[in-house]
Every structure is written in C-alpha cells, then in structure tokens.
C-alpha cells in the first residue's frame, strides 16, 4: 500500500508499495532522507522547487511544470510504477504556460496535486477521473482561498480532499485548514503519514 508523507506547505512525498519514492514540490519541512526516484515540480516559484532538499537515487528524473506544458498541450510520463500527467493550473499569479497540476497513479491509487492554482475550466473534467486524494492549495494569496478550494473540491469529487499550501512560508495553518470543507476531508499535518 502506498504512503503519503506531508512535509508542509505544498511539499509531500509518496512512497510506493515497492519502496519507490516520489517528491512533489520540495521546499518545506523534513522527511527528505529517502532517495528520490522521481520529482514533480508544479511551478518555478522558490517555494516549490528546492532540489537541494533531495538526494537523487540512480536514474532519478525531475519533471518541471514549465517542461510539461506550453499552456495548450500537457505532457505525461511513467517512472518506477508512478504514472503521471500534467493538467492545467493557473491564476493571476501563475501563467498557464509555466504552472501545472499533476494527476499521479501508483499502486491503484489516483492523486491530484493541484499546484498553485485557482478554479480552472478543467476541474469539472476531474470529476470523471475518480480521484482518490486531491491536495488543494488554500492560502488565498498566491492561489485560491479555503472557500474557493472547498467549491473546487465539490466539483472534483475526490474520495478525500486535503488542504495544503495554507499560508506563505509556513508549514501549516490549522485555522485556514479548518475553513476548508469537503466530503472526505482529511487534515494531514506536517510530519504525518497516511496510507493511501
């Protein structure tokens, strides 16, 4: 069974049942000791792309949002049992051509890492994806706030929705997370793990 470890802010790690390790948006917190087989970076803002945190395993691959889209077309890939594809993520602070979300599948579980985004035209299509875990930003400064994220969660219809990116340069703000409402809501605090 795959496992998610939340480092804080927008940073998290997923370890497959076979022990392969993927990091998304490395920046905040600890828990970077396991060598990375795969790293996904949703955008190039400093709080999403600190590769100095990562020790790369032999053959590690890094996929950056800017390389996964031109704003119209979106790439996909597969590495060590992780299947992933980029999807639109954008708002007034993030251009369509520079930022993406990722849908990741591993061990029969589907995860949506929204990246820095607000509501997108693509989100209604996510309802048909049967997403198990949606990780949604909620800070309301560089992306949508908790109320808008709650509305997006209702559209996406993931089995579980997790509020992240709750406050700039802060691992986690429980007050913001408490304002996020969604069926199957999970609150995961920095340093906590969940079985997927």
Segments (PLM) and residue ranges:
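Cap/insert and terminal regions of metallo-dependent hydrolase folds
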Residues: 120-196
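Short, conserved loop/helix-junction motifs that constitute active-site signature segments
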Residues: 32-34, 52-59, 127-130, 152-157
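Short internal beta-strands
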Residues: 41, 59-67, 160-165
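Core dinuclear metal-dependent hydrolase active-site scaffold
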Residues: 1-34, 38, 65-128, 144, ...
């Amino acid at each position: 069974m795959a496992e998610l470890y939340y480092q804080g802010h927008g940073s998290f790690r997923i370890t497959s049942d076979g022990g392969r390790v993927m990091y998304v948006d490395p920046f905040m917190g600890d828990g970077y000791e396991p060598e990375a087989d795969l790293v996904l970076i949703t955008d190039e803002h400093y709080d999403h792309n600190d590769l100095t945190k990562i020790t790369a395993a032999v053959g590690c691959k890094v996929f950056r949002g800017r390389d996964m889209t031109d704003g119209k077309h979106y790439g996909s890939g597969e590495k060590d049992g992780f299947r992933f594809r980029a999807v639109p993520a954008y708002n007034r602070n993030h251009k369509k051509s520079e930022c993406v979300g990722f849908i990741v599948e591993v061990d029969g579980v589907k995860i949506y890492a929204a990246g820095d985004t607000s509501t997108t035209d693509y989100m209604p299509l996510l309802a048909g994806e049967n997403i198990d875990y949606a990780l949604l930003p909620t800070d309301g400064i560089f992306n949508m706030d908790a109320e808008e994220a709650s509305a997006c969660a209702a559209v996406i219809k993931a089995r579980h929705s997790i509020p992240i990116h709750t406050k700039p340069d802060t691992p986690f703000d429980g007050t913001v997370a408490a304002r996020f409402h969604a069926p199957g809501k999970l609150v995961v605090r920095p340093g906590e793990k969940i079985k997927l």
